[in-house]
Amino acid sequence: ERPLVLDADALNLAAEGLFDLRALAKSRPILSTPHAGEMSRLLGESKSNIIDDRLAALREAVRRFEHCFLLKGTPSLILNAGRGILVGSQGTSDLAVGGMGDSLTGVCGALLAQGLGVMEAGALSLYLTGRAANLAARGASLTPTDVIQWIPDVLVERGAGISELGLPFVSYDADAAR
């Protein structure tokens, strides 16, 4: 089966029990991309508990639903069963506006359609959208359109091509969060 990326209303419907997220994950690769509010509904925990220990929430979601999760926030975290945790290193708090999650999900879907694995698609999507936000340099007025318009520039950027982690899209030289 083809991979799925789930966000927003799909996650809310799963939280309401309208479909079995765990059973669906047995039939195909899934990447779920909740923010803290969506994760709180999925896990039946308060949003403050999710925010207080994002890593524990991420681990619990992966354990309970048996697929890859990208927990959006500062920093964004990605985890899949049996894999290490990936930490998003690009972007700023300016990405926390309406529509940015849709941009991230769209990039994830495009990368999944090209054959990337769910964890790799999530990590590369975080990098592409975060770096594009940094290049747009719009500050608090940043819009999803700004981010999408800068992705082609990110794709042609050239760096050293070396990563101590063996992942060419992970870097730790990001600007400090605002």
Regions found by a protein language model. Give the residues of each.
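Glycine-rich phosphate/dinucleotide-binding loop and adjoining beta-alpha-beta core of small-molecule
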Residues: 1-90, 156-178
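A short glycine-/small-residue-rich loop at the edge of a beta-strand within enzyme catalytic domains
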Residues: 30, 48-52, 95-98, 138, ...
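Solvent-exposed, flexible loop/coil residues
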Residues: 15-17, 46, 99, 146, ...
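Flexible, active-site-adjacent loop/turn segments at secondary-structure boundaries
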Residues: 9-12, 37, 93-95, 140, ...
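Gly/Ser/Thr-rich active-site loops/lids in small-molecule metabolic enzymes
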Residues: 51-64, 87-112, 118
